[in-house]
Amino acid sequence: DLANNFSVYFKKFKKKLSKYMQDAIIKGNKHSGKEYAEAIDFMKRSYESYQEVFEDYHGVLSPSSPGVAPKGLKSTGTAEFNKVWSYLGTPCISLPLLEGENNLPLGVQLIGDKYDDHRFLGVARWLEKECEE
């Protein structure tokens, strides 16, 4: 999906894109239209099974990353734990609610349901306030 959405920018601004983005677009462009359609269908079916969670809960908590935030400002760390939620099209937000080694933040990720951003952000605000106390 990334390749499909960013190929125009790749053609015009390739040198301005990070190596990661360039590689991801090149890799994505190797898939056929049929493979892309199958992936979109799989994503829709995956979301349908995930959506059942929100019949009983307002959000899902998970780690934001495998560890604490990296030192400095060069990187925000890995986005591996966020990819599945982006793939499903669900909102997710990382909140620095915990503290790890060297007083670096350890993020907790809150995941919400599609098209329910107002409630999702309210739950995020509530969670942040509860953890401050």
Which role fits each region the language model picked out?
Residues E38, S65-V84:
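Short, surface-exposed loop/helix-turn segments at secondary-structure junctions
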Residues D1, G77-T78, V108-I111:
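Short low-complexity, flexible loop/linker segments enriched in glycine and/or proline
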Residues A3, T78-F81, A124:
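Amphipathic alpha-helical segments in well-structured domains
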Residues S49-Q51, T76-P96:
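Small-aliphatic-rich amphipathic alpha-helix that forms the alpha element of a beta-alpha
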